[in-house]
């Protein structure tokens, strides 16, 4: 059975197949830095787990206390963690969107072509 973590706050950062040349699908680390600041202030007792692809050096500006990284994990483990997170911040991706549809807790939505559900919070 996979080693599944249930994060307090899960942030999906889409990387791998997208980069800064694809504005419609890419959210910069600076934008995520603002999101993390908001989350750390709003949820002062929770930790944040970032789910993404790449090397830890790709996220140097996001590294701080209470922020952990799960990079290059299996799709199944990452998806399950996003679905079960107490707070989920979606990326601009159908993968994130699918997890958000199944997540029964708090979901934060970053605007892209899939429309948010009424109970999601817009970032």
Which residues does each predicted region cover?
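Secretory-pathway luminal glycosyltransferase catalytic domains
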Residues: 1-43
